[in-house]
From Swiss-Prot:
NCBIfam families: PRK00124.1. It holds the Pfam family DUF188. Belongs to the UPF0178 family. This is UPF0178 protein HEAR0259. HAMAP family: UPF0178 (MF_00489). It comes from Herminiimonas arsenicoxydans. InterPro entries: UPF0178 (IPR003791).
Amino acid sequence: MQIWVDADACPSVIKDVLFRVADRLQVQVTLVANKLLRTPPSRFIRAIQVPAGFDVADNEIVRLVQEGDLVITGDIPLAADVLEKGGLPLNPRGEFYTKDTIQQQLTMRTFMDELRSSGVDTGGPAAFSQSDTRNFANQLDRFLTRTGK
């Protein structure tokens, strides 16, 4: 089991949590992005830089993820693809995407996109908070405990 990170939009505080977990539990954490990433020196942390382009980083994660791997992403279509491959997508706010809920989330995302394209101001997600970081860290800890890490 390893942890993949859709790093282009992942908050820095979440990356910091993952860096600490990588060394403490000796689990491989791989960040994938279309920009250069700074990572602490560790044999358990690596970064993959992909060419710029729509969904290039997402496609690389889908190509590399294996059954049982954890994928950190807030991207709902990527989460759906990860679920199809047997991976476990977790968003940076600490919520797992599941096969039971992903279709509803994809439908809502499409609906909100249609509203925005018709000129409706839908607002955006709430600002990322310390509570979100705590929720993520707690959910990650529970997951790693269940998997024996």
